[in-house]
Amino acid sequence: MNNVLIIGCGLLGSSLVRRISKKKIAKKIFVYDKSKLNLAKTRKLKLPVIIVKSLNDGVANSDLIIFCTPMSEYKNIILKINKDLNQKHIITDVGSSKIKSSETIKKNLKKKIFWTSSHPITGSEVSGPEYGKQDLFVNKWCVLIKEKKTNLKHLKFLGSFWKKMGSKIVIMSKEKHDKIFSITSHLPHLVAYNLVKSAQDFEKKQKFNLIKYSAGGLRDFSRIAASNEIMWRDIFFDNKNNISKAIDIFVKNLKAFKKDINSKNNKSILNKLIKTKKVRAKIIKLKQDINKPDFGRN
């Protein structure tokens, strides 16, 4: 690969820059970002990139194009770069939902140009190039989306690319992807936002100062709820059907917990708590986290 264009130099985009540069995967790294603040930070950090003022300039000089923006920006980006795309371009993204975004891309992408979607399962509640890390993708899953008309050469190339990023590769359909992550990612974020809002509402109604006592559960949820609001709005809207079903399951279980608490059903509630505790052990066994108490991030 000669050159890569990264559209959006925030947390993920800047982490890609750092990794690509360290591993010498591309000769040149072009970056486009409509945020003047992000560009100023990129310059200040002296990231090894060529900042392009025009998307078209970046596309014309690149082999690989990676969308690292909120998904609501995909359509406008495609419409701007369509005229400069050719069949040699490999185009992908890092978006967290796939059905709606893929439909939007395909509807607006010019004919005979292929879109192959990626989802590296990593991130943080913070955003901006100053938070990027070259090892952000190391030992993390990266989902590649395979469809009937997927260009297999592009899929193979992206598998190799993400392995160089340090990722473990899994291939699945966009439908399976959105169902899985509605439960493992999208619902937990929604619950975090709602829990923090509930604390705010309670604090306002009771006139208690709750926040200063947030050393336990609320603190952990508040970290998740600090995630980028535009990105998560897009995810909630794009994967609304699966998320709505996930909410139904959550509400059903919440009502069951409420019933057990009110009736002091010792056997039922202990059974639930023990079963759910086992999930944590399984996550550690699968090396998705470490068996170490977390009293605050470093």
Predicted ranges, named:
Residues 3, 28, 114, 141, ...:
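Residues at the starts of beta-strands that form the adenosine-phosphate
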